[in-house]
UniProtKB/Swiss-Prot annotation:
Location in or out of the cell: Cell inner membrane
InterPro entries given in the database record: Cation/Ac_symporter_ActP, Na/Glc_symporter_sf, Na/solute_symporter, Na/solute_symporter_CS, Sodium:Solute_Symporter
Reported function: Transports acetate.
Name of the molecule in the record: Cation/acetate symporter ActP
Chief location bin: membrane
A single GO cellular-component term on record: plasma membrane
Membrane topology value: Multi-pass membrane protein
Record keywords, A-Z: Cell inner membrane, Cell membrane, Ion transport, Membrane, Sodium, Sodium transport, Symport, Transmembrane, Transmembrane helix, Transport
Length: 549
């Protein structure tokens, strides 16, 4: 039965702009037993790690941050594993397969946010926070209002991202493994809950590390075999690809992805600032011992991800040569079997045979598990630490907080499974785009200004943050993706697909205006507290390290 894999595009941040290139009609494939066996090996191994981790999770610190004893190198790998989705691998390589050079430009968009995290956020975040970014945002501001806003921003981002991942996971597994969609969604949800429920951050970290290593190895092998085919010459790679691609030399020309400068700028800002506001990424900086290790984490993560996206570019051009020009991988109509999303999977078969094809399919499944585990833990910590322990029941014991966190994991898991089933045939490609827009318009401005602007007050942060969040949601609804494609209206009220340029501007302007006009005694006190916060953020003085942090 024919299915539309728009959900796969949704598992890639802001992939909606490339939906035409990386989505299309696909068929459920025959059961891939080699892939299933390899995936079962991965599951058994990671469940063993979860059991090992569960014996070492004795406190709140262990559960949320793995005791703060993850090294910078390990955390860099885990961050890369948390950030690189299955669709980063399949989607971007498919985009290169169809559009050529534009795929490289698009993939680089995922890296532009990391220098901001490295130079502006990582060190200060680690010096000021303990478990969530709300610890930093509320350091000198009113705990209640700021934590509620931060938790809401986190939960909305996590929920949207999680639904998109679950639907994408079901479609992807149905495509690669031949398993039933509902079985796939339940399987992902159950494994996700087991990793987080029993192993906490320690198990999640090692699942992400293993996934990153497997993905980097698989992509490296594919790129190596492609380059070997062309004599390790990029000139030969591009020449052969241009010779067989229907667009010819045009695949080396940029500019086909974004329709106008406003959309390009808005997309870029959303990718850049959204990355710096993702709660499951920011939470990883509390797993290392100090600010130095936090900086090293970003350095290693950026290196791993940069290397990975270069590999997807080579893989995409390799697919043009070895898959696009091979009738074995096409149906009777001349289209790629399974759709363009299968370009990298077919290439795995072309360069490594059925065994390597099974390995790549299993790795694609593993990437989904690593991402949803990180999302679930971030959502649970927002509820248990930010809302329960610091707003609704101040002074709650560690045991009570951990109990709430684990209950939240179960609730999030069940909700994710239910919504994954309900949204099976819905267009959810907008969800991750909206998640990034909210992260960029609500979370990022508050984090940045709370650390760098001495005049920020609770009033400004609250009003500006909520304005940014609401603006992002409203403009996304009124834009072409939801208003026209989903709701069926003839013309969009808001003409641009990406609201980030406007919603980020509203957030920063609102925070500045309402802080600058705040003449209350509370506002004056909050401004006076900035100096002490600044000294701690720069020096780390007073920060607890390692297992005690």
């Amino acid at each position: 039965m024919k299915r539309v894999l728009t959900a796969l595009a949704a598992t890639l941040p802001f992939a909606a702009n490339a939906a035409d290139a990386i989505s299309g009609a696909v068929e459920r494939q025959p059961t891939n037993w080699q892939a299933i066996i390899m995936f079962l090996i991965f599951v058994v191994f990671t469940l063993g790690i979860t059991y090992w981790a569960s014996k070492r999770v004795r406190s709140r610190n262990d559960y949320y941050t793995a005791g703060g004893n993850i090294t910078g190198f390990q955390n860099g790998l885990a961050i890369a594993g948390d950030y690189m989705s299955a669709a980063s691998f399949l989607g971007i390589s498919a985009l290169v397969f169809t559009s050529g050079y534009d795929g490289l430009i698009y993939s680089l968009g995922f890296l532009v946010g990391w220098p901001i995290i490295l130079f502006l956020i990582a060190e200060r975040l680690r010096n000021l926070g303990r478990y969530t970014f709300a610890d930093v945002a509320s350091y000198r501001l009113k705990q209640g209002p700021i934590r509620i806003l931060s938790a809401c921003g986190s939960l909305v981002v996590v929920a949207l991202y999680l639904i998109a991942q679950m639907v994408g996971a079901g479609k992807l597994i149905e495509l690669l493994f031949g398993l039933n969609y509902h079985i796939a969604v339940v399987l992902v949800g159950v494994l996700m809950m087991m990793y987080v429920l029993f192993g906490g951050m320690l198990a999640t970290t090692w699942v992400q590390i293993i996934k990153a290593v497997l993905l980097l190895f698989g992509a490296s092998f594919m790129a190596f075999m492609v380059m070997k085919h062309v004599g390790f010459s990029f000139n030969n790679l591009f020449s052969e690809a241009m010779a067989v691609h229907p667009k010819g030399v045009d695949i080396m020309k940029p500019g086909g992805l974004v329709k106008d400068p406003i959309s390009a700028l808005s997309l870029g800002l959303g990718l850049m600032f959204g990355t710096a506001g993702l709660p499951h990424i920011l939470m990883r900086f509390f797993t290392v011992s100090d600010a130095r290790e936090a900086r090293k984490s970003v350095f290693y993560a950026t290196g791993f991800m940069g290397y990975f996206y270069i590999l997807t570019f080579i893989i995409g051009f390799g697919a043009i040569m070895l898959v696009g020009a091979n009738p074995e991988y096409k149906d009777a109509a001349g289209h790629l079997i399974g759709g363009n999303n299968m370009a990298a999977v077919h290439l795995a078969n072309a360069v490594g045979g059925n065994l390597f094809l099974g390995f790549i399919s299993a790795v694609a499944f593993a990437t989904i598990l690593a991402v949803v585990a990180g999302l679930t833990l971030a959502g649970a910590s927002a509820v248990s630490h930010d809302l329960y322990a610091n707003v609704f029941k101040k002074g709650a014991t560690e045991r009570e907080e951990l109990r709430v966190s684990k209950i939240t994991v179960l609730i999030l898991g069940v909700i994710a499974i239910i919504l994954g089933v309900l949204f099976e045939n819905q267009n959810i490609a907008f969800m991750v785009g909206l998640a990034f827009a909210i992260a960029a318009s609500c979370n990022f401005p508050i984090i940045l200004l709370s650390m760098y602007w001495s005049k920020l007050t609770t009033r400004g942060a609250m009003l500006g943050g909520w304005l940014g969040l609401i603006t992002a949601v409203v403009l996304m609804i009124l834009g072409p993706t939801i208003w026209v494609q989903i709701l069926g209206h003839e013309k969009a009220i808001f003409p641009y697909e990406y609201p980030a340029l406007f919603s980020i501007s509203v957030a920063f302007l609102g925070i500045w205006l309402f802080s600058a006009t705040d003449n209350s005694a509370e506002g004056a006190r909050e401004r006076e507290l900035f100096r002490a916060q600044f000294i701690r953020s720069q020096t780390g003085f007073g920060v607890e390290q390692g297992r005690a942090h």
